């Protein structure tokens, strides 16, 4: 009788556990950084260029293997801005094998644009070569909110802190150039996080340096130091824009 009683089932039933599948191959195989990349857009952020207040968006690209991130600023949410930002990312980080994203309109249209351009080529050999070498797009299932955690988790790391920081600062004195620099500073901070914890025993005479995504991207074991000086809240209203950015960067790091 208990299994047919709805009230008893709620009171005595065991909670349903989340069934997790194995990690995909792109998360476990050693490959060059950003060979498999997840992409998403976050924002918006209000900036003031000259006397005009505008909205800007952040484009996040994360490596599925090294968990490194790369940020770009989008002036709009249309396909043209996305393609230009994607091409600039590829010029910096190198070619991407697979690009994972949700079913955003700008992502889908960009995939169709690239495929249409290859089909319009007149030379068969060039068309065949590009069709095998170009980046392939992989979209998550529509209305599947449980998918895309690879990039959604990285967006949460940045968006929640950055949005709260800009609101608490109560300032709209940041222009697009300053926002770009701030996102790059945040990118460096996020990529400096260690993969695992490290322990330092008493018999060790050296400092144990943890492995970070920045080590894999730059092949250097030294972190970028901030510029010398003390940055305080009055710097938000300074005419020196670089001091505004450095103050916000220090606040982001402390949170």
Short names for language-model regions:
Residues 71-95, 119:
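Active-site beta-loop-alpha junctions of metal-dependent nucleic acid enzymes
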Residues 25-30, 112-127, 131:
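Acidic, Ser/Thr-rich peripheral helices and adjacent loops at domain boundaries
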Residues 1-38, 251-255:
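Amphipathic alpha-helical
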Residues 7, 45-48, 68-69, 78-81, ...:
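Flexible loop/turn segments at secondary-structure boundaries
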Residues 27-70, 75-77:
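An active-site-proximal beta-strand-loop segment
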Residues 5-8, 112-113, 127-255:
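Domain-scale segment recognizer with a strong primary affinity
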Residues 49-53, 64-65, 89-97, 128-135:
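Secondary-structure transition/capping motifs at alpha-helix termini
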Residues 91-114:
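Acidic/histidine-rich, metal-coordinating catalytic segments
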